[in-house]
C-alpha cells in the first residue's frame, strides 16, 4: 500500500529486475525477484512514488470516463463503428463478420502493396491488434470488428508491411505511410478505444 493505493506484489525466480505496472483495470503490480530484499523493494517504490501517483490519477480519470461510457452502451455493441443491439450478436457472429471483411480486403491490399501472406487467423483475447509471424502468418484481434473500417485497413497495412520489413524501422513506417497516409491518427484512435472495445465484447455470449 502506498498512500491508499493498493499494490499487488508478484515474486518469481524468473523475474530479474524490479518493475512497476498499472493495468487498465487500475491494479498496481510490483514485480520483483525472489532474492530481492524488502528494503530494496520499499526504496524502489519510494523512487517511483511521484510517477505512480501521477500515472494512477490520470488512468483513474480515464477509467471513470470508460465506465461512464460503458453505461451508455448497455446492451449495445459496435460493428464497424455502428451501434447495434448486443442481443442480436454472439462472439461467433462477430468473428464471422470480421473474417468476411478480412477475406475481402487482405488480398486486395496485399496485391496493392505487392506482397503476400501465408494465411490469417482471428483471436478472441489477443493482447495486440495484429501480428505477423516470421513465416508471414497474420493474426488479428476480434475487437477490431468494433472499429471503423478505415482503422481496420490500417492494421491490415501495418501487418502486411511486416511481411516486407520484420521490424519497426524507418523503412517499415515509410511503407505504412505510403499506403495509409493518416496512419498516425488511426493508430492513436485505436489506442484510445481498444480497452473500450474489449469491454464491449465481454457482454456477449460465445
PLM region spans:
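Active-site-proximal or metal-binding-adjacent scaffold patches in catalytic folds
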Residues: 1-154, 163-206
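Walker B catalytic acidic pair
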Residues: 159
Amino acid at each position: 500500500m502506498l498512500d491508499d493505493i493498493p499494490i499487488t506484489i508478484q515474486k518469481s525466480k524468473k523475474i530479474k529486475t524490479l518493475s512497476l505496472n498499472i493495468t487498465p483495470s487500475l491494479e498496481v503490480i510490483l514485480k520483483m525477484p525472489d532474492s530481492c530484499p524488502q528494503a530494496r523493494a520499499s526504496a524502489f517504490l519510494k523512487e517511483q512514488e511521484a510517477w505512480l501517483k501521477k500515472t494512477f490519477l490520470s488512468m483513474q480519470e480515464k477509467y471513470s470516463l470508460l465506465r461512464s461510457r460503458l453505461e451508455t452502451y448497455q446492451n449495445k455493441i459496435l460493428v464497424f463503428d455502428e451501434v447495434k443491439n448486443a442481443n442480436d450478436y454472439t462472439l461467433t457472429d462477430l468473428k464471422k463478420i470480421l473474417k468476411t471483411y478480412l477475406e475481402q480486403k487482405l488480398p486486395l491490399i496485399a496485391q496493392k502493396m505487392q506482397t503476400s501472406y501465408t494465411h490469417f487467423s482471428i483471436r478472441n483475447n489477443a493482447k495486440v491488434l495484429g501480428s505477423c509471424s516470421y513465416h508471414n502468418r497474420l493474426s488479428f484481434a476480434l475487437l477490431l470488428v468494433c472499429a471503423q473500417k478505415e482503422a481496420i485497413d490500417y492494421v491490415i497495412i501495418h501487418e502486411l508491411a511486416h511481411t516486407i520489413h520484420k521490424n519497426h524501422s524507418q523503412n517499415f513506417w515509410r511503407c505504412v505511410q505510403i499506403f495509409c497516409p493518416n496512419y498516425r491518427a488511426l493508430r492513436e484512435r485505436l489506442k484510445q478505444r481498444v480497452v473500450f472495445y474489449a469491454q464491449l465484447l465481454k457482454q456477449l455470449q460465445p
